[in-house]
């Protein structure tokens, strides 16, 4: 199966925070925000072959909603930093000639990603894209 030529790599907690505001105090509410974000991403991926999405969260695995695994990959960093995994994925994807857009507001991460030839997109702008039909 051919991979799409564009990958949106999303700095998970950073993007969810940018879209939904400060993280709630309880894990249950944090998970609800993440689930809402993942569900919207999944809905957006249905019916298109133009891109894939990789969503990277800090921390250990948590239950997530069912997703279209051919188009949406959810990664938990475990003990590593999400930023390190994101940069590793950018380098790998660029090496294989894919176009990469990083969705983040983290300016340090964005600067490093630009050095690797990734494009940067603000999470609010990305949310506006996925909130309307393709």
Question: Each predicted region: which residue ranges?
Answer:
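Nuclease catalytic cores that cleave nucleic-acid phosphodiester bonds
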Residues: 2-8, 14-134
């Amino acid at each position: 199966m051919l991979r799409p030529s564009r990958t949106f790599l999303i700095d998970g907690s950073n993007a969810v925070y940018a879209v939904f505001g400060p993280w709630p105090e309880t894990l249950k509410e944090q998970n609800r925000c993440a689930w809402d974000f993942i569900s919207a991403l999944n809905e957006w991926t249905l019916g298109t072959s133009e891109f894939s999405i990789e969503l990277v969260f800090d921390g250990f695995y948590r239950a997530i909603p069912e997703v279209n695994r051919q188009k949406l990959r959810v990664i938990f960093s475990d003990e590593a930093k999400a930023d390190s995994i994101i940069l590793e994925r950018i380098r790998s994807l660029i090496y294989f000639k894919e176009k990469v857009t990083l969705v983040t507001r983290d300016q340090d991460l964005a600067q490093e990603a630009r050095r690797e030839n990734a494009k940067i997109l603000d999470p609010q702008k990305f949310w506006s894209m996925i909130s309307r039909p393709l």
